[in-house]
Amino acid sequence: GDCLPHLKRCKADNDCCGKKCKRRGTNAEKRCR
């Protein structure tokens, strides 16, 4: 299935993230929870 936009933004490779995005550090887009 498709990811929600804010979940998709979590990872740089556009992989499906969890339900929460870790907004810590400079690479927040790569930090998924």
From Swiss-Prot:
Changing K11A: 6.83-fold decrease of stimulation of [3H]ryanodine binding to RYR1. Belongs to the scorpion calcin family. Changing C16A: Linear IpCa; Loss of stimulation of [3H]ryanodine binding to RYR1. Changing C32A: Linear IpCa; Loss of stimulation of [3H]ryanodine binding to RYR1. PROSITE patterns: SCORPION_CALCINE (PS60028). Changing R24A: Loss of stimulation of [3H]ryanodine binding to RYR1. It comes from the Eukaryota. This is Imperacalcin. GO terms for cellular component: extracellular region. The record marks H6, K11, K30 as: Important for stimulation of [3H]ryanodine binding to RYR1. Its main location: secreted. It holds the Pfam family Toxin_27. Changing L4A: 1.93-fold decrease of stimulation of [3H]ryanodine binding to RYR1. The keyword Disulfide bond applies. Disulfide bonds join C3-C17, C10-C21, C16-C32. Changing K19A: 4.96-fold decrease of stimulation of [3H]ryanodine binding to RYR1. It comes from Pandinus imperator. Changing R31A: Loss of stimulation of [3H]ryanodine binding to RYR1. Residues 8-9, 19-20, 25-27 are annotated as: Important for stimulation of [3H]ryanodine binding to RYR1. GO terms for molecular function: calcium channel inhibitor activity; toxin activity. Changing G25A: 23.96-fold decrease of stimulation of [3H]ryanodine binding to RYR1. The presence of a 'disulfide through disulfide knot' structurally defines this protein as a knottin. The record marks L7, R31, R33 as: Essential for stimulation of [3H]ryanodine binding to RYR1.
